[in-house]
Structure formats: C-alpha cells, structure tokens
Amino acid sequence: MTKKLTAQEKLNRKPIPTACVFCHEKHLQCDLGRPCQNCSKRGIGDTCRDKERKPRKRGPRKVKKEREVSASTKSEISNTINQQLIPVINTATAVSNRQNSSKIIKAKQTGVSTKKTRISKLAMDSLPLQMPVINSPSDMFGKQKKVMSPELPKIPSLTQLFNPTAEPIISDALLPSNQNSAANLPSLADKTPLEEFKNKPLSERAPQQGPQQPAQQLLPIPEKLNSDHTSSNSSTGEFGSVWTTEEYTKLNDMLSTPNLSRNNSKTYLNSNIAWSPSNMMKMDPITESQRPINTQELLNLTSNGLKRTHSRPHISLDQMASESKRHSANDTSPESQGGETVENLSPYRFRLLVKTPEDLYKHQALIQPHNYKSAYLELLRFLRWRFINSDKPSSGKSQRDGPEQLQNIAHSIKTHYAPIFVTLTNSLIAQDLKLQEIILQRALLEYESMAKLVNCTPMCIWRRSGEICFASNEFISLTGFNKKEILNKRKFIMEFMDNESIVDYYDIFHEYLAFGSTQSGPFNSSTGTSDGQAIFSECNLLLKNGCYLRCACIWTVKRDAFNIPMLIMGQFLPIFDIE
C-alpha cells in the first residue's frame, strides 16, 4: 500500500516552473534551490542549472490570436478616448453657461459649439498618435507601406559613378583637400612632356650638356613619374615587397649582364635583351653564341663596361643599397646602434643562438626575411670567376667552354626557373617572406636532429640560392673541411663542385626539381621520385686536397606553402672505381 505523504512532503513535491538539467533527464522531482537536493546528494551541485526550454513554434493559430488581440486593443483605445473626452466637454459647457447667462440662447449655443470644437481639438492633440496596425498582407504592401517606410536613397549605377561628365555623387566638402580635382587636372589639349619629347626631331632629343649632377638626380623618383603621367609604380618595384623585387632583380642581372672572354673579343650573353615574359623564348644558347658582333657594337660594350640592365629605369636597387649603407653609417640613433640582427649572422653563429624550436620562437622578433639579393650578387661574381676569369682550357677543350657553360646556366634560369618563380612570388608581402624564413629555420632544425640521431650518408643542406646552411659530420669527414670553414661565412654548394657538375645541377634543379617536373622524361621514370621532390644524379665533389671525388648523389627539395623551394638537401655517396 502506498505510504501516505505528510504535508511537508506534499509541499516539496509541488511542481516548479523550471527543473534542473539532471532532474529533467532523470524525471525526478526538482526543487527551487540551486543546487537542488538531488544534485547535492549525488555530488554534482556544481553542474546544477536550469533546463533551457525550446522556443515554441508560431503556428497559424498563434498569428490569428494576435490579430484578435490587436483588434480588441484598438477598440479599447477608442473607447478610452471617448470616455475621456465626455467629462472635459461637459465641464467646459457648464463654465460657458455661467459666464454667458445674460446672452441670448442663440449666441450661447453658438459659443458652446465653438468651444466644443476647440476643446476636442486640444484633447486630440494631447493624446499620443496611434500607430497603424497591419491586419493583412494587402495592407502591408498597400497604402500602409507608403506611410510606414521612409524613402530609401537612390544608389547610382556603375555607369553613373564612372562617368567623368556626370555630376559628382559625393559632396566636395567630404572630399580630402589633397586629392586632384577636375580643375587641377591638365586638359586633354595640353601635351605631356613625354608627348612633346616624342614629337621632337631626333636631333633635338639629345640631352644638353651641363654641369655634372649628383647620382641621386640621374634617376627619377616615383613622385616625378606620377606627376609626369608616365608611371605609377611604388618604390618597392613591381612586386608587393622589396625582398622579392631584389631577388628578381639579381636573377635578371644574371641573365642580362654581358660576359667577355679574355682571349677574344666576342660576347656569349646578349646584353641588349633584358629578361621579360614577352621575349622569354627568344634566346637560344647555340644561335646566340654563333652570332657575329661588329666592331662598333664591341666598342660600345667596352666603353660602357659591364653594366647591368635594369628592367625598371625608375629605381636602382644598387643605389638604394649604397644610400642605405651611407645613411646607416651616419645614423647614431640608439635603434641603429643596437645589437646585431639574426639576418646578418652566419649559419654557424645562428646555430649557437638558436639550438631548439623554443629558442627559435623566443627570438622570432629578430628574424627578418633573408637577403637573397646579396646572395645572388655574390653567386654571380663566383660564377664569372669560375667559368670566365679562371677558365684554363685543356688540350681537349676549346677556350669557349667556360662562357658557353655559363650561358647554358643563364638559359636554364631564363627558360625553366624565372617565369614560374616570378608568377609565384608576385603576390607575396613582407610578412609572407618573414614567415617563410621562420618555416625554413624550423625545417632546418628537424633536418639537423635527423642527421644527428640517425647514421646517414654525408649530407649538406643549402638554400635555393646555393648558400650552405648545414653540413653533417659525415660530410665534414668526407671532404676534409671543418664546420667553421663551411658555415662561419657564406659558402655556396657550387664551390664544392666542378664546372660540369655545376651545369648539371642547375639543369636538374631548374627543369625538374625546383617546382616539380612538368614533362615526362628519364628523371621521372628511372632516376626520380613520383612526387617530384627528389632526383638521383652524379657529381664530382671537391676535397680539401684539391682533388675531386666522384659521388652518387640525391637532391631533395623542401618547398613552402606557396610551392617555392626553400631548402635543398644533398646526400653524397662516394663511388670508388675498381681497377
């Protein structure tokens, strides 16, 4: 038999508006306390909270009920107004009767009716206006829409916005004062300096001889270009960052700088053609090397010296670098006299500062994008010295082997590497390049730890410019050099190869390894990997005694998120010929 409940138990078991989450799920009787008794007994009082109810759906019955309520409210408001107006009118009538008792009845009735009208108007003005109630969709889209909705401003079309002859949409008071207005712009009838220069005869186009001007005035600055309506490029060049522009400029210098042989008067790199996507495929190593050069062209080359061809005449990166060095030498501010940045450290000194990933992120603020401009400039000087200046022809080779090999390298850069590199780096900004450098250093730490933990073949890691970043102990033992000789200053991997190995390396790297092979060939089938990130080859490795050791090698590339090569890892295994 069911136990009879006491009065207190009946009171406790009364239903409450909202139960807690636990009691709602377990179907228990909850109380008003928080935490409730059920949660307190079970030790879960910290999680005791009210159960949130789902919002009810608004069906057609609910909408119909709201309409009825609105109609009844409307009738109540009208009744209230009538009830409030009746005593006001009666009081006014009594007062007028006492004041006009001596007048005739007709005048009294006329005055009463006039005052009634005035009082009713005052009463209606004192009451708040009633908002229109929308009872049907027809009212919503009918007359009520015109009353409730304010008129929206008209938005001009694109044709009206970009029409120069139309009236201005924005007020002149809102426009900045430093912008060029229509009155400040030159008329179409006025000729720009460029058009006047084109219309002059050839005899008048020669510059007038005058006093010697400083080097800064020889190159026009971007402000002058903008004022002459000839160019609108910013000071950073054609790309979003100055680092990408400098790297592209050095690649362009390697392609467009003339190289003269010592023993003859012929050039093997065409200096009159600067690299551009339009004339990308015009240079051929065979036809260019066999093209005869007349005496006048040779005299012009000799008198002008080995000048670089600037693809952007309005900016000189070399002059900017010299100017920045001069300003930094004269600058005595505490910011410029601070500690050395990570960018200027050699790989050997950088590893003494950053040994773990924690150190890398600790010194993250000091890391700057790598200066590939100076790297390519020094690499260009080394390649000239290796292939031209120090070229000693043997009995089986002609004197033109060195310049022809250098021309093959330039042709490989121009055909396979530079177009894709420019396309991928066109949209990069300074923050992207800084992130690339941080990712490069983080990947380099992983490669170094792998080389230390696992006994591997001799390994060396370098950047896409050829700068060596890491050399394993096995590589040091194989070549005979020590780590300070390789890592304490800028060293290129090309310094440890002979001429033929350098040419083969650039052919493999530019055509198959840098951005992945785009064509099927022997490197994809037999000596390469399926992902296009590793290539097997052979090279001659320089030893400390001056001899070359034949090695089987594999080049592995590490790319970033933009598919740009960051690091190249080379593993070398010596090949000993059996006699």
Swiss-Prot record:
Residue ranges, compositional bias (Basic residues): 54-64
Gene3D superfamilies assigned: Zn(2)-C6 fungal-type DNA-binding domain
Presence of keyword Ubl conjugation: no
DNA-binding region, residues: 20-48
GO cellular component, one term: nucleus
GO molecular function annotation: DNA-binding transcription factor activity, RNA polymerase II-specific; RNA polymerase II transcription regulatory region sequence-specific DNA binding; zinc ion binding
Keywords: DNA-binding, Metal-binding, Nucleus, Transcription, Transcription regulation, Zinc
CDD domains (alphabetical): GAL4
Segments for region (Disordered): 43-75, 319-342
Residues of the PAS domain: 444-516
Comp. bias intervals (Polar residues): 330-339
Main location: nucleus
Chain intervals with Basic and acidic residues compositional bias: 43-53
Keyword Transcription recorded: yes
A single BP term in Gene Ontology: cellular response to starvation
Subcellular location per the Swiss-Prot or TrEMBL entry: Nucleus
SUPFAM superfamilies noted in UniProt: PYP-like sensor domain (PAS domain), Zn2/Cys6 DNA-binding domain
SMART domains: GAL4
Family per record: Belongs to the ERT1/acuK family.
Record function comment: Transcription factor which regulates nonfermentable carbon utilization.
Name of the protein in question: Glucose starvation modulator protein 1
Origin species: Kluyveromyces lactis (strain ATCC 8585 / CBS 2359 / DSM 70799 / NBRC 1267 / NRRL Y-1140 / WM37)
